[in-house]
Every structure is written in C-alpha cells, then in structure tokens.
Amino acid sequence: MATAQLYCVCRQPYDVSRFMIECDICKDWFHGSCVEVEEHYAVDIDVYHCPNCDVHHGPSLMKKRRNWHRHDYTEPDDGSKPVQAGTSVFVRELQARTFPSGDEILQPMHGGQVTQRYLERHGFRYPIIVSKREELGLRLPPPDFSIKDVERYVGGNKVIDVIDVARQADSKMKLKAFVKYYYSPQRPKVLNVISLEFSDTKMAELVVVPDIAQKMSWVENYWPDDSYFPKPFVQKYCLMGVKDSYTDFHIDFGGTSVWYHVLWGEKIFYLIKPTPANLALYEEWSSSPNQSEVFFGEKVDKCYKCVVRQGTTLLIPTGWIHAVLTSQDCMAFGGNFLHNLNIGMQLRCYEMERRLKTPDLFKFPYFEAICWYVAKNLLETLKESREENCLPPEYLIKGVKALITALRNWLKREVTEPASEVPDHIRPNHLIKMLTKEIQYLENGNCGNKPMKLQESSICPSTRSAHERGSHARKTARRLRGHHHHHHRHHHHHHHHHHHNHQHSDGPKAPSHLDIYEQHTQEVLKRLEMGPYEEDASFNLKVNGKFNKVSTASAAAAERSLENDLRLVLCNGQIVR
C-alpha cells in the first residue's frame, strides 16, 4: 500500500483545510503556520524561499508596489485603470464625497419604543437608530473591552475569516495572529473582521441580543430542536475593524434584518432604500465584471450617509443596500434575523442571491428549510385566527402569499435540482394546499355573519411569537385540541409551550377530567373520519394510531397545558398517561 506523500518541516501529509505555500527553490510545500507565513501575507511574496533554502539563497523576494488604487498593487500606474473599491485612494475619495444626510431616513427612537407591537403597527421599513441601548434589552461587555479580551474569551487558536481591505479578498488566520497584527506599531495593511460568530464560545455569555431581534427571529421562534438540519447561528457577531476598513455595497444574506452596536470607535454606513428600481440596479451592478470599479452609491438617486458613533445601535430592515466604512479603529457587535414583517422582501433577496450564484458560505444557512418550518407554523396561526374570529394583519397575509409562491417554485425546481431542504416530516404539497385554503378563506370573505376583529398582537394569535405565547396565561377549554405529548424519534421534546389568555372573571371554568376526555375522544373520532391531517400540529395522529414525528417549535404550540394540567397520551387508541 502506497504511503501518503509527506510535506513541510513537520513531515505531514497534505491537508486541504490548511493554507500551504510552495518553495520556489526546492518545490516542497509548507504549512503557512509551520513557517510563519500568514495566508494574506503570502500574496505579497514574489519568490518564496523556505527556511531550508533561505540559508543558501537569502530571504524571499517581495512584490514591488506600483500603485495605490488597484487591487493588484503590482499593476503599472499608467493612469489608464480606474480606482477599485477598498484601496487607499478609494477610501480617500469616499471620505471627500458628499451624501444626503442619514437624518432624512433614520428613525431615532428610545430603546423602549422599539417593540414588536410598534413594528407590527408601523412597519419596519426604515433604519432605526437608538442612542441608549439599555431599554433595547441589549447587553454587551463594557466599553473598555479590548481586542485582547476577545482573544481571551474566544480563544487565540480559533480560525477566523479576515478581509484584506485593499484587495477586497478573504483569507483565514488564527485570532491570535490578528491580535498580534492589530497591536503592531505599524500595520502593514488594512485587515477587517466582520464574520466572527461567537455563539459557540464563552463570549456568548457576555452578549444578550436586543429583545426585538430575539422575539421576532424565525430561528428563535420556529426552528425545531430536533431538526435534521443544523441550527443557523447568525445572531452574535463581533466586528473588529481597523481605520479605513471598507465593506462594499451588499444586502445582508437572505434579506435578514440586522442590528449593529458600536462598542467603541466609529462606523459610517452608506444606505440605499430597496426600491424595485434600486434592487434591479444592484443586481445588475453585482453581476457586472467591473463591479469593483463602479461606486454603486452613484448609480442610484439617493445614497444616505449615516455616522454611527460609540454607544449607538443601528437597526437595518430587510433588503437595505449598504456599504460600511470604519472611520477609526472600532469594535462593534451585531446580529442577523429573519422575521414575519417583510417576508416577501426576504424571499426576493434570497432569489436574487440564487440568480447571482452567491456561494453558500455567504448565504443564510438552510434558508429554504426555515421557510418550510415557518409555513407550517403560520398555517397554525391562520387557523387560530379564523377560529377566534380574528383578521390577521395585512403584512402577514401578504407574507404568506409570497411564501406560498416561493414554496411552489422550490418544489418545481427540485425536479431538476434535487438538493432538498424540505424537512422530512413535512408534506410539502399538502402544506401549500392548506395555506392556500386559509388565504382563499380570508380573501373570499368566508368569515360567517360575524364581523371579524382586526388583529392586535395582545388579543389574537398570529402576531404572537412562540416566546410571547409561552408567557400568556392558560387558555379556555374550548381551545383544547390534541393535548398529547409529541413523541420524537429519540425522546420527548418540549419546545416553547404556547399558552393563551384565560379570562378568570367571565371565562368558562376549567373543565373536569371527564370533559377533557370526552372532548379529546370526539376530536380523535372526528379527525379519523376526515382522514389523516398531518399538517395540523394539534393532531399529528396517523390513521394507524401511531404518532407522527412533529418537529416544529410551534407544532409544540399545540401542547397547551390547562389549570388541571392533565396530559393524555394515546398509544394505539389507549390512554397510557
């Protein structure tokens, strides 16, 4: 059996996951970490001499800089080529440009005003700026928290993505190497860290995300704990940028909304409204071969400049196109979240990413899977609204329609591109059919003779998140449906229990065990007559009496406990508990 070829001073086999560099003399390959050559630094080497060869041949030869305005600084500066984004000339020119003030579009608010109820009523269409974070529910390290502190909490050996700003190129390095770079008296280049997600580190305990991002987040509300797909972690980022760092115009992945808080330093945001015209221009610009040579802010009617100073929090809604300049060394925290308020725009952004062939690394993880989970939950929400004679808010009806269209298209696409993100317990065609029925019911005005109540998040179910439902008092017996434990493949699983308002004054008394048993039996018989109804989270019995796997957080919504806390678990028609 042939043995693997060994490389480097460490004499290890080739490892695709580690950066390596070839010696131009002996032609052996070396791990950058073994010979102290960082990946971002290797591009500056013209002729590399390994530690063995530089004894006889002298040190490696470096490339010679010939310009300050191109990503490739070795190109001759003959004045024929335009300035490229991120270069030192570009940053200087950007700082000299004039822009309409962000005050024209920013909504200054107190943290306590930024609530789910407020955004449901007024929409989340414009960026919100909050100067005092306390009432937002945002908890962060103190303002003297340093880059070294990040290393202490995250670990110096964590491999992070770093952007070489002047080249707008991504590379990997260990956090301890970035810390060394940051504190070096003369930094050889501008490096920017914008994608250090630290949910899986000790630093996660120091940060509590804003209430609004937690309460409205699809992942927090709808992602089931037993999902086959790994849970997306996009809520806790630490951004470490040195002066003159620049990130070119982009829309956050999957059309996520984003919160940013500048702990110290300063960032300047260049914000563009996601109008249909601007989105079309953005897509055209993103796919053009000379994208880096065109400043997108000049292509649109208005690009607003917004300075975010120390201690300030910025909330950017779905689809806003933005670039960011770090005007002084800066540490910021941020996070991304999908929500129910702008479902259509989120889907438009995702479809644009697909058309632009955005690499998976830069997309929202398992975006389609979460849309299926959300659809399953919103079906329950629409049913509850109908049964409680509530009219769901307009944004939700529009959102569900957009979701139905997207889900249909994804199913069609699966025929030619089988890369399914449909969770295995969801019957996709049935789910789409039931959602469509609920929307038709609303649009045809089949609401009986009673006038429908316009929905308020405090009264009706559809705008209450899993968290809010969990905190509500228990619901009356009328809503009792299928109060069995959901059996999962591996174990009983309790997601957020969803409770509902119980009017103590004039509501019906809590039912007796016999009442519950009788009602439960009637439900079961009724369902069995109608045939299996898998998408109904309140039922989940197959005809053979066995439990379906139910795996959405709000499927567990059906598990509403009453004052008497009786649980009925059916197994082959027998009550076993």
From Swiss-Prot:
Residues 472-502 have a biased composition (Basic residues). It comes from Danio rerio (Zebrafish). One of its GO terms (molecular function) is 2-oxoglutarate-dependent dioxygenase activity. Belongs to the JHDM1 histone demethylase family. JHDM1D subfamily. This is Lysine-specific demethylase 7B. The keyword Zinc-finger applies. Its cofactor is Fe(2+). Its main location: nucleus. A zinc finger (PHD-type) spans 5-56. GO terms for cellular component: nucleus. Its EC number is 1.14.11.-. Histone demethylase required for brain development. Specifically demethylates dimethylated 'Lys-9' and 'Lys-27' (H3K9me2 and H3K27me2, respectively) of histone H3 and monomethylated histone H4 'Lys-20' residue (H4K20Me1), thereby playing a central role in histone code. Residues 460-513 are annotated as: Disordered. Signal peptide: none annotated. Residues 198-354 form the JmjC domain. The PHD-type zinc finger mediates the binding to H3K4me3. Binding to H3K4me3 prevents its access to H3K9me2. Keywords: Chromatin regulator, Dioxygenase, Iron, Metal-binding, Neurogenesis, Nucleus, Oxidoreductase, Transcription, Transcription regulation, Zinc, Zinc-finger. Fe cation binds at H250, D252, H322. InterPro entries: JHD, JHDM1_Histone_Demethylase, JmjC_dom, Zinc_finger_PHD-type_CS, Znf_FYVE_PHD, Znf_PHD, Znf_PHD-finger. Predominantly expressed in brain. It is found in: Nucleus.
